[in-house]
């Protein structure tokens, strides 16, 4: 068991807590959780005797006085949540058995919390329910004009966005290679030059680039990108700054992907290896001129730091890179890159021909990337796509769709939803609502895809460094959430008996380090994974 079990051997938790500091309590609890047996009964006894309070020689009859397993579990979780680090903080937990919905543990489970990226559970569940796991998003390239015998195409090339978030390395897609293939298609049609415009059709969504409640100081960063139905490279650019070594030169700045769409103005002071690297980007939300200020520490040209920053106007960014692919293929272009809103008449007529229709990977794969890596742009595009299906690609309409799905699934309506990713602090929900969603999803037709989308400890994703070596490593699938003074974790855990629980752990208004919040959540998961309803197990 964990800290609570140890405390009882000292005559009660309050006595034990007075004897040890909170950090010591956590260290002991963590060590004991790691000692939790993973295999058969023959290997479990020594660890269980240690957990019971180091009394390996106590008479067998004393086991009869142990609390019932469920009470012992609750006492242990109470002990973990009662250390000084969480005094004054907002702490909520809900653990629910998937067999009949029994509430295994609850603390402040009906209080409202900021969910951070756990919000993505609502978004991805609703998307799977609305579209289905095999749904894909289509982007088209159309020609509206005439191809002359000389190989010159006179007219417009129209790139129409279909809410596909996958054109980036995060989804395993080489967007540059994809555009090169598109240029090859145009070349195969005999097009050697284009006299006209390349038009980006982004009318599937409204023109509101940011969700309500996003902080202004988040906007320069890649995790707070502008949202539209045309998205490329996560609507961001990576800026790498390399130390000049011993040369008295400024640091070298490179962009990936290489682009002239963004201009970086560096103001970086070079330090030796005893210094601290700290880079701060400044970008007006309507500009692609980035001021990069700060310091770069190191002594060799291998000392490089990379920051990922958002770009303004994702539609224009996409068109710029498509034009670059045409130029690489040798297709000359005479015209402008335009948003469809800046064109008087682009209504399809008999000349308009769709020459490329690109379909994304299935939604089940998209939500896996969104939940495992906490991909904000993908979540926001799903929200607006759901709104579009119901008549308007906006945050308001997308939120309405999500709420309707949650009501239908019995999750309830007493929550505030502002965006799809959880970046907004205007989102509010309860631990019970999150656990209920997980329980309902478990029985839904799309539930297998939803569960498979969650991160697993030790594997690719936001849990890759957590719970490793413990029983929970192979028993937990969950979604993380994190922002200043907020840390959340919600998902599924399988107990030692094979019983499945849905759980939600939500922490807010705390000043402890995020690492300590993660440790607390991990310890609760370890304790749940080691739970058995069999007395004495």
Feature-to-residue mapping (PLM):
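Short active-site loop at a secondary-structure junction
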Residues: 106-126, 367
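Bacterial N-terminal signal peptides
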Residues: 22-37
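Conserved serine DD-peptidase/penicillin-binding transpeptidase domain
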Residues: 43-83, 129-412, 519, 527-537
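Small-residue-rich helix-loop
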Residues: 104-106, 373, 380-537
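N-terminal secretory signal peptides that target proteins for export/translocation
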Residues: 1-21
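Residue-level preference for non-acidic, small/hydrophobic
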Residues: 101, 120-127, 198, 230, ...
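A short, well-structured edge-of-sheet supersecondary motif
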Residues: 82-107, 338
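A short glycine/serine-rich beta->alpha loop
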Residues: 108-113, 308, 421-424
């Amino acid at each position: 068991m964990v800290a609570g079990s140890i405390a009882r051997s000292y005559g009660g938790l309050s006595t034990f807590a007075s004897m040890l500091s909170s950090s010591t309590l956590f260290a002991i609890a963590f060590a004991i959780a790691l000692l939790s047996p993973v295999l058969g009964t023959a290997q479990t006894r020594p660890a269980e005797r240690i957990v019971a309070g180091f009394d390996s020689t106590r008479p067998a009859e004393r086991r009869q006085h142990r609390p019932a397993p469920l009470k012992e579990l609750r006492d242990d979780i109470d002990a973990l949540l009662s250390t000084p680090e969480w005094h004054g903080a907002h702490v909520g937990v809900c653990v629910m058995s998937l067999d009949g919905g029994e509430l295994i543990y609850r603390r402040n489970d009906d209080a409202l919390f900021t969910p951070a990226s756990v919000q993505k559970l609502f978004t991805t569940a609703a998307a799977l329910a609305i579209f289905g796991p095999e749904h894909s998003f289509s982007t088209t390239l159309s020609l509206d004009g005439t191809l002359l015998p000389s190989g010159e195409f006179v007219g417009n090339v129209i790139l129409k966005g279909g809410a596909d978030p996958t054109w980036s390395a995060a989804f395993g897609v080489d967007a540059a290679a994809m555009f090169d293939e598109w240029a090859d298609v145009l070349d195969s049609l005999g097009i050697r030059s284009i006299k006209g415009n390349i038009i980006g059709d982004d009318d599937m969504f409204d023109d509101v680039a940011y969700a309500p409640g996003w902080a202004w100081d988040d906007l320069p960063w890649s995790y707070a990108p502008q949202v539209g139905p045309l998205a490329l490279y996560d609507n961001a650019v990576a800026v790498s700054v390399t130390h000049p070594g011993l040369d008295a030169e400024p640091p070298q700045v490179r962009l990936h992907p290489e682009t002239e769409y963004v201009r970086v103005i560096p103001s970086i002071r070079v330090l030796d290896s005893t210094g601290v690297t700290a880079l701060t980007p400044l970008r007006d939300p309507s500009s692609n001129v980035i001021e990069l200020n700060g310091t770069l520490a190191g002594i060799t040209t291998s000392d490089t730091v990379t920051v990922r920053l958002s770009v303004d106007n994702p539609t224009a960014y996409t068109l710029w890179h498509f034009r670059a692919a045409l130029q690489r293929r040798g297709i000359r272009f005479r015209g402008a890159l335009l948003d469809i809103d800046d064109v008087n008449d682009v209504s399809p007529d008999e000349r308009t021909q769709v020459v490329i229709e690109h379909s994304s990977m299935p939604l089940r794969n998209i939500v896996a990337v969104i939940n495992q890596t906490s991909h904000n742009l993908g979540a926001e595009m799903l929200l607006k796509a759901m709104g579009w299906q119901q008549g308007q690609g906006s945050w308001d309409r997308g939120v309405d769709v999500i709420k309707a799905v949650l009501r239908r699934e019995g999750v309830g309506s007493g929550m505030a939803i502002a965006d799809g990713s959880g970046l907004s602090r205007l989102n509010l929900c309860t631990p019970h609502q999150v656990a209920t969603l997980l329980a309902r999803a478990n029985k839904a037709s799309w539930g297998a895809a939803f569960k498979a989308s969650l991160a697993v400890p030790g594997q690719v994703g936001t849990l890759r460094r957590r719970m490793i070596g413990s029983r929970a490593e192979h028993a937990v699938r969950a979604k993380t959430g994190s922002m200043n003074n907020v840390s959340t974790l919600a998902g599924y855990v399988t107990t030692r008996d094979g019983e499945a629980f849905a759980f939600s752990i939500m922490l807010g208004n705390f000043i402890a380090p995020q690492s300590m919040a993660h440790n607390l959540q991990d310890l609760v998961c370890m304790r749940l994974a080691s739970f058995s309803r069999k007395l004495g197990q």
